Amino acid sequence: MSKESTRPFPTLPAQIDLPAMEHEVLRRWEEHKIFERSLEQTQGGPTWVFYEGPPTANGTPGVHHVEARVFKDVFPRFKTMKGFYVERKAGWDCHGLPVEVAVEKELGISGKKDIEAFGIAEFNARCRESVLRNVDAFTEMTRRMGYWVNMDEAYRTMDREYVESVWWAIKQIWDKGLLVQDYRISPYCPRCGTTLSDHELAQGYETVTDPSVYVRFPLTSGPLAGQAALLVWTTTPWTLVSNTAVAVHPEVDYVVATDGSEQLVVAEPLVGAALGDGWTLTGQRFKGAELERWTYQRPFELVEFDSPAHFVVLGDYVTVEDGTGLVHQAPAFGADDMQVCRAYGLPVVNPVRNDGTFEEHLDLVGDEFFKTADAALVADLKDRGLLFKHLDYEHSYPHCWRCHTPLMYYAVPSWYIKTTAIKDQLLAENAKTNWVPANVKDGRYGEWLRNNVDWALSRSRYWGTPLPIWEFPDGRRICVGSLKELSELSGQDLSDLDPHRPYVDDIVIPDPDADPSLPLEQRVARRVPEVIDVWFDSGAMPFAQWGAPHRNQEKFEANFPAQYICEAIDQTRGWFYSLMAVSTLVFGRSSYENVVCLGHILAEDGRKMSKHLGNILEPIPVMDRHGADALRWFMAASGSPWMPRRVGHTVLEEIVRKVLLTYYNSASFFTLYAGAGDGWSHEQLADAPAPQDRPLLDRWILSELHSLIKTVDDALERFDTALAGRALTTFIDDLSNWYVRRSRRRFWAGAGTPEGAAAFATLFECLETLTLLMAPIVPFITDHVWQALRRPDAPESVHLASWPKADESLIDPALSEQMALVRRLVELGRAARVDSGQRVRQPLARALVGAPGFAELPEQLRAQIAEELNVVQLDPLSVVGGDLVDYSVKPNFRALGKRFGKTTPRVAQAIREADAKTLVERLRADNAATVDVDGEQVVLSADEVVVTEQPREGWTVASEAGETVALDLELTPELRRAGVAREVIRLVQDARKSSGLNISDRIHLWWSATDEMTAQAMAEHAEAISSEVLAVSFTEGTGDADAYEVVSEEFGITLRLRKA
């Protein structure tokens, strides 16, 4: 027999500092390399692949970053405990506008001119430094929250090997003819000087108020020339400077309306909305197709056109949902405009420069920023009599997702990946993917795929993966897939090249067939100036994290595709999309099988966290106040993770109190009592009766435990941490507030006794298994408790232990149902006692119970009800003739009015005339009842009837859902004395705690009573009192002078005690 197996359990103190405990656990994990060992012991087993979505290292982490990282940690821990090898490689998204904007702020510069004046090489060096600096902050948060991921070998999208892999992927897409340069309308940020992709666009909408103007365009040709004007609506008056045409729908009817002073052409369905009152139709009606090529006077003559323009064109996209049905066309600033005007050979006129300002020579708006030019333009239209109506229009307008500058839709040459060509493949891959929650698949994400547009890949920026395309003066192009290939093409060794701007820009590729007499620039290819969308970087991580295919190809193949990825819901248009798109473009299949989408984390006040509002919670201070486990539990198990949730100190304090400390206190109770007296050891617990031979209460909690294993296992397999959390919370409450409390007397049993062994063994088995089940969600407190509970042959850490398996033979659904009934009846009885104002410790003569299933309860369970309700006798309600409660009912007019309207008075009268007892019984049994209203049976719900109960004198009654408990309130002298004895026991137990006694300490007890009934109670219940308070002597008298004294004036007694 080992010494370890016979040692008492180490005590878990009653009080615990959770953050301090977590720091100690972190130290132990690192010293003993627990994470590394968890990987070592599963290596060679089945693999479960998880991809770390790389956070953008452009600032310090917020508490919302904890959410996704909790989910990234829970499931790999869970799968590892189930024997899977789960390699967890961290990653950092290093490139892109987020980093550039942050560095610009640090340097006190703004815009591309300032960056180029500062120097691209130095600017990019500062970007690299910024990334590395912020990586440290994320690393600290990751460690503190207990997220196990390999930070030492993290991939970084700025590393040479990663960039080479991205180049390889771009070359694959190029070779398939899916990467093209085109002159298209793209979302464009004038401050950043670059286009954005549609998935970036989706992340930056803000609510703004813009002018909504209706403008007259006088007709200059056609049957209405000189008589009428086209009425055009726009919310972007600044684009009127470049007006080229007016589009109408060919099939819509357009009419002429007059107010007596002028005539306006408007789509017939919009006459009322656009013109208002006072307008009549002249009777002239034209199909849109008839208006084609009618010319008009353009609203501004600030820019020159080099070919004919300013006539009506046809566009099927024109609608009659709002506006006037006539749409102003400025092809430089709208994709639909560009498409329609191109078909008519109309010119594209763009007077707005790359920085978003109008060209300086223009009247009215020269050098003005496009959004602020509206006011001057609208005022000029009004002065010239062209402004028909001006309103303020609140709407959602796209802004740059990083610098928050209003975007323009701008005609610029850009590089596009033709993702529209693989739309059907993307939809097919999505159909195979398991989305959590399921509605995202065909909803938010499916809709995004169905409306797929080509991916605007290029960015006119600096800190990013350079687009690996070199172009000769004659337009020939080469796409390069690696530094090795570039070395061969350029004729120099570039294996150590930093593949970023400006260094890669200096590399030229000579044309071997060029005339050597030509100037150098005419004989070499230079790289195009753009870098690529940062989302392509992160979308390439399945292979680029390994540097594949140039290196580690086997590693990539073994880790593709992923069984699991997870991020916030907005990544449906970000990383989730780029991952699927890149892999489908390159490999013909998606790179993931299961994806979890998380709702956003809000501040406690329900608003988005922001520095401006002062409601940001920093993760490290929060964890050092409440503990990381509390924050982890909130993220994983509080409410629905798929919905927005509010986090704050209040909810975290509640988690600590209701979940973590309730669990810990049960474990502390076990170790305290197991160590009391001679103490219990693992060997002694092993000799406990078999589960099926233990008392009913033990069999019940073990049944609940093994049902819990199944529930939590199934929930986590389906990525449902909320269900797992609810089940665990319920069991923790069952264990602490029912099982432990109901079993307290058995925990006093001496070592080696069957009743004590059964109780201790059952509680140990529950705590051990509960600790295993909670470990993936709250890894700190469970590993701390594990150290106290650990069997001699158990792993050093709970995170090295195996996931528990349910024993179906111990699951007893019938017993679970019976115990649930017992607890419902106890709650009803307690409610009845509270209503009566009677003390909880005052025994009552009897309780009467009316409930389906009560008659079948075994005596042990009936005894539990009696003891919990503190009654001497428990009988069925049927033993009492007549009713113990008088009922009255009346209508709830507020609830009835919502449903019945004008017929409410007749329904209310039917309720008054109904038999109250029958109506209440039906409502409580079925949550619904019928009444006769003018010969028609009307179904009422419970909230539509107000029920008043009046118990008969001497009784208190509580009922719910067809179950009733009635308490007899008549007190005999014997019951009163028993109640006093209970109060005395409470006084002594409180005194034991206050005097610093241990739970197993025996005492000497002296008492003296001035109240006659109290004195009688002490004499009558001396044995019971002594047993409960561990008194080896029970003496009437004053006792030792140095004994601990308690005086109760209420019960007229003085108590003194000291340790025996």
Swiss-Prot record:
Key words, A-Z: Aminoacyl-tRNA synthetase, ATP-binding, Cytoplasm, Ligase, Metal-binding, Nucleotide-binding, Protein biosynthesis, Zinc
Keyword ATP-binding: yes
Family matches, as SUPFAM superfamilies: Anticodon-binding domain of a subclass of class I aminoacyl-tRNA synthetases, Nucleotidylyl transferase, ValRS/IleRS/LeuRS editing domain
Required co-factors: Zn(2+)
Record's subcellular location: Cytoplasm
Protein's job: Catalyzes the attachment of isoleucine to tRNA(Ile). As IleRS can inadvertently accommodate and process structurally similar amino acids such as valine, to avoid such errors it has two additional distinct tRNA(Ile)-dependent editing activities. One activity is designated as 'pretransfer' editing and involves the hydrolysis of activated Val-AMP. The other activity is designated 'posttransfer' editing and involves deacylation of mischarged Val-tRNA(Ile).
Motif annotated as 'HIGH' region, chain positions: 55-65
Family: Belongs to the class-I aminoacyl-tRNA synthetase family. IleS type 2 subfamily.
Cellular component terms per the entry's GO annotation: cytoplasm
Pfam assignment, any one: tRNA-synt_1
Name under which the protein is recorded: Isoleucine--tRNA ligase
GO molecular function, one term: tRNA binding
Keyword Nucleotide-binding attributed: yes
InterPro entries xrefs: aa-tRNA-synth_Ia, Anticodon_Ile_ABEc, Ile-tRNA-ligase, Ile-tRNA-ligase_type2, M/V/L/I-tRNA-synth_anticd-bd, Rossmann-like_a/b/a_fold, tRNAsynth_Ia_anticodon-bd, Val/Leu/Ile-tRNA-synth_edit
Ranges spanned by the short sequence motif 'KMSKS' region, renumbered to the chain: 608-612
Species in which this protein is naturally found: Thermobifida fusca (strain YX)
Binding-site residues, ATP: 611
Enzyme class: ligase
